[in-house]
Regions:
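Glycine-rich phosphate/pyrophosphate-handling loop used in enzymes and phosphotransfer proteins
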Residues: 1-204, 209-244
């Protein structure tokens, strides 16, 4: 019940003021940060420890490439994420995907410094696509919202039509990595009217789980002639051996 009142308070503040003066996580009053209170900032699982150089996941020790990438090297050039997919971030991303579009600003605010520091050579931003039916059902593509905000902030052009989702695919959550790859095979392609040849692309998404979706999308972009495809997400699932 306490959580319900906090959520109602957050929504009321936004409706009246048009600004975030309450923490998007707990509803407490904000002072030093634009989106999160001090307590939540201290508890959020930022992806700031050891990470895999390739997929950017949180790993248990300081080694260059995680075992999963060694076993199945992804097609993207590299990937990074602002948070580890655990704790309150899991709840917030679920809310983001089920109507709470305002969270795009808070997430993009944490992705922006990574974009500037890690992907300085980016020529173009893109996002993981959804089918028109899926966008209609949800009302928006959450990855497009993130990419749009990041493009406005950094000035890197956003190519909204770079990738096309050609068909509906089965829910990915319960599938193994091999099943995900089979499920997504041929489901993402580069739009024939877009040009990515010779460009460095940053692909935006909300969550990286196994990385299969990002890898399939990157493969299509690289086949179309892009120089590189880096991936930037709100959060990524940590290395399997870690208990975060």
């Amino acid at each position: 019940m306490k959580g319900l009142f906090a959520e109602m308070a957050k929504r009321a503040v936004r409706l009246v003021s048009g600004e975030n003066i309450a923490c998007v996580c707990c509803g407490a009053e904000l002072f030093s940060d634009k989106y999160f209170c001090e307590r939540c900032l201290d508890s959020l699982p930022f992806n700031a420890g050891y990470i895999c150089d390739k997929c950017g996941r949180a790993i248990a020790d300081d080694y260059p490439v995680c075992p999963e990438c060694k076993a199945h090297m992804p097609d993207y050039t590299s990937a990074r994420s602002a948070f580890v997919y655990s704790g309150e971030i899991v709840r917030l991303i679920k809310e983001f995907k089920t109507g709470e579009k305002y969270l795009a600003e808070a997430f993009a605010d944490r992705m922006f410094p990574i974009l500037l520091s890690q992907f300085r050579d980016a020529d173009m931003l893109a996002f993981v696509p959804m089918t028109p039916r899926a966008v209609k059902d949800r009302g928006y593509n959450q990855s497009e919202l993130l990419a749009d905000i990041l493009s406005q902030r950094c000035g890197i052009p956003l190519e909204r039509e770079l990738l096309v989702k050609t068909r509906e695919t089965a829910e990915q959550k319960e599938l193994s990595a091999a099943e995900r790859a089979k499920n997504l095979q041929g489901s993402i392609r580069v739009h024939e009217r877009t040009v990515c040849r010779g460009k460095n692309i940053v692909l935006i998404d909300d969550v990286m789980t196994t990385g299969t979706t990002a890898s399939v999308a990157a493969k299509a972009i690289l086949r179309a002639g892009a120089l590189s495809v880096h991936v930037l997400t709100v959060a990524s699932v940590p290395e399997r051996s870690q208990n975060i």
